[in-house]
Amino acid sequence: MPPELPIEHEMKSSVRGMYLASHFYNFWHAAPMEEVTPFIEDLALWGCNTLMLCLAPQHYRSFTSPEAFETADRLKKIFACAAELGIAPALILFSNTGFLDRSEDIAAPWDMRGEYITPNYAELHKEICPNLPGGMDEIRRCHREFFELFSDVPVKYFAYWAYDEGGCTCDACSRWSENGFIKVYEESVKPLLSEYFPDAKLILSTWHFDRHLRDEGKRLYENLSAGKYPWAEYVMAVYGDGQFMPLTAEHGAPDGRSVIDFPEISMWGGKPWGGYGANPLTMRLDNFFSSVGDVLDGGFPYSEGFWENINEFCCMSHYSGAHADTADAVRDYVRFYFGINDPEPLLRAVELLEITLWRKVETMPDGRLRVTPHFPAAIREAYRLVTEADAAMNDTAKRDPRWRIIYLRAVIDYELYTHDFIPMNSARAQKCFRELWALYHAYDTRIQPAVCPPLGR
């Protein structure tokens, strides 16, 4: 099929990114590079021009440790692969998160106090209070080691992170996003960025804004509109998480800043993420994109693995302007990867898999799981459409990991539906989970439960 876009096609957005969350021993963290590379090549084909990765301090005793060096080396290999394809590197920059052995003498409190409406969320709570004696010195040490570790990478963007991980609820740091967070930037991030990465651009992330403090997004929007934080050339907004995105949609980008999004395309629908196969969110993404119009300048979708490959494609399609909506994007995805001339049945199957994605996961008294989709009525039809497509495909398309995760999702859900929603009741479901384990490289004993399919449960 000849290309439909003219050769002079102008990309819609300037930041066509993807965030591969390389942690928890998920696919991006553990899979062999020869399996990761084809997915990065796909991103380049779709129009991606920047790739964000993460090295989180709370998992290491130092960024000079052998374990940190090992992970950093992997990230650099991913960056090098991307660079060969014209994709620029980006990194998450934690504000006040410390190392695994962070001293309790400088620990940031995270309980509810003052204006806080929830405790500060973090996985390991290794945050450092910048206002305690020695706190800012330790934050600077963490940042310097981080910048030194990646000083041989031409990082284009750093996404400066306030929460998850990050934050401090003490009186001296409150309100964190307007006070302690800014103090850390001024006294640690700013001078070290100038020293190590003077040409890098800074993205201010609003992840978890308005979860801990009321009106956080609104106050940020007002502060930016008034010209504050001129170093924040980009602002990362989050759908359905606070006030910043709705204000941007209604009034435009504040003070001419470039606003980008951070679509959550991996975790929605329940744990374990990707544990049942593909998790298409194409209609949800359409709602997101249509809610803000053309005010955004791209984004970094949040990927925990390749089970959301079709969601990545839809996001890149939106950023590039290649398709009018996600339905058209899915049609082209089905034609290109699976060699199917009539994409309508599989488009319908993808939509049904999205409808049946959201599920309740319970552990029964005997230890077995019960997994109940909230809208199970469409499971049989999705299964019929997917298995009929599988029967018509050639062997190469059938073996494609992009297809296997769709096929396995339809089969697993059908087996749940016909076996009282208890995975252990179906030998066929267990066989599918084993295949997902192999696809995700979940046999690494260090893998976290959140990204491990529920084999044997």
Describe each model-derived feature in a short phrase:
Residues P2-T50, C54:
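An acidic-aromatic substrate-binding cleft motif
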Residues A21-H23, T37, N49-A56, R61-P343, ...:
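Catalytic-core regions of glycoside hydrolase
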Residues S303-E308, H323-R457:
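C-terminal non-catalytic alpha-helical accessory regions
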